[in-house]
Every structure is written in structure tokens, then in C-alpha cells.
Amino acid sequence: MKRVALLFLVVICGMGGLGQKLKPKKRSNGEEINFRTKTKDVCTMRISGDEEMKARIECKGQGKSYWCEYTGMPLLCHPFQNNPKMYWNQITMELRKLPHACESTQMLKASMCQKAPVDALMKQVAAGVEPEDGANRDKSSQKTSASVRGAGKSSVKKTGKPAVLPRIKPTQHGQGSENETEAMKLAREHCWESLHEFCSYIIGFFRG
């Protein structure tokens, strides 16, 4: 009788241990992971959802703020079910290698789920850029207005002095030009066409 009772206890303990093994580990729903990109952008990835999960990434750095969202069903990947934390750590390691956490990739892939179906991949579904804060906008507008004023002053300085055009001396009709005209007339009347200039020169020379 004692042996039967002991055997019964062993079976119950074994079933309890089996139940603990079959019980899935705690999921990463609601977890936040902080990381930096290759260009030192400070980013936060927030994970939510149950079967279909969503990962929202928000980053700030180098005067810009941007965000993007990914959705997928990583539960279809069996290694994810056993260790979801390692899955997200692998994805974060890949994001750290990128200069831009949202523009550089359309899918989030973990090496532990390379053989998983396509639906298990986290695909980008939305992305955007946040506007600059008020201080940065004011500074940029002040710089723009200052540059416009500077350009206006420089244009006024350049166009302030009127351009001075050179004076054109009037053509003087002297005695020499009249002699040349008469000499050419005589040359045309008394010389061959090919000798007009020569005859005009000789006639002008003798007419003085």
C-alpha cells in the first residue's frame, strides 16, 4: 500500500513538472528597449500586442525626431515562444548597426527566426518625422530673415552707384575724308575696278 502511495506521488509530481515545462515563458508585451543607432540617435522601442505584435520605435538625434511602427506575428517562430527576450535583443543589435532606425530597413529580422514563415517577420507599416520644437524653429527663422536682410543690403550697395558709361567721341568730318571721297569717285571713273583703291590712293596723294 505504501508503494502504491509513493508511486502515486511520483506520478503527480512528474505531471506538475511537465506542466511547468509546457507553460510558456513570460512574453515581452509592454516592454521598452532603449538603444542608440550607428549615428548616435537615441531610440526607444515599445512592444505591445498578443498574437499580432506591434513594435514602435521613436528616435531623436542630430536636430531631428522620427518614428516608425512594425507589426508581425513572431509567435509563429518557435524559438520566440521559448525566449522572446532574446528575440528582441537580436533585433535591437541589428538596429544599433544602422545609421537610421526607420529608413534603413523595412523588416525587423532576428537570427533565431530565420526559418520562420513570412508572417512571423515584423514589417514596417508606418513612419514619420516629428516637427522641430519652437526654439529650433525660431532660431532657423531668425537665421533666414538675417540672411535675407544681408542679401538686401549687399544688393543695395552693389546697385547704389550708377554705372558710368564711356563717352563716345563724335565722328569728325574733316577735309581729309572729303578728299578721300572725291579721290575714290575719280578712281572709279578712270581706273579698272581691281585698281580702284590704288588709284584712289595716288589721286589723294597728289591732291594733297
UniProtKB/Swiss-Prot annotation:
Gene Ontology terms, cellular component aspect?
A: extracellular region
InterPro entries linked: FGF1-bd
Q: Name one GO biological process term.
A: cell-cell signaling
UniProt keyword Disulfide bond, yes or no: yes
Any signal peptide, and if so, which residues? Answer: 1-19
Residue numbers spanned by region Disordered: 130-181
A family per Pfam: FGF-BP1
Please list the disulfide bridges: 43-59, 68-102, 77-113, 191-199
Instruction: Please give the chief subcellular localization of this protein.
Output: secreted
Q: Where in the cell is it found?
A: Secreted, Extracellular space
UniProt keyword terms in alphabetical order: Disulfide bond, Growth factor binding, Secreted, Signal
Q: A GO molecular function for this record?
A: growth factor binding
Can you tell me which family this protein belongs to? Answer: Belongs to the fibroblast growth factor-binding protein family.
Q: What is this protein called?
A: Fibroblast growth factor-binding protein 2
Identify the coding gene: FGFBP2
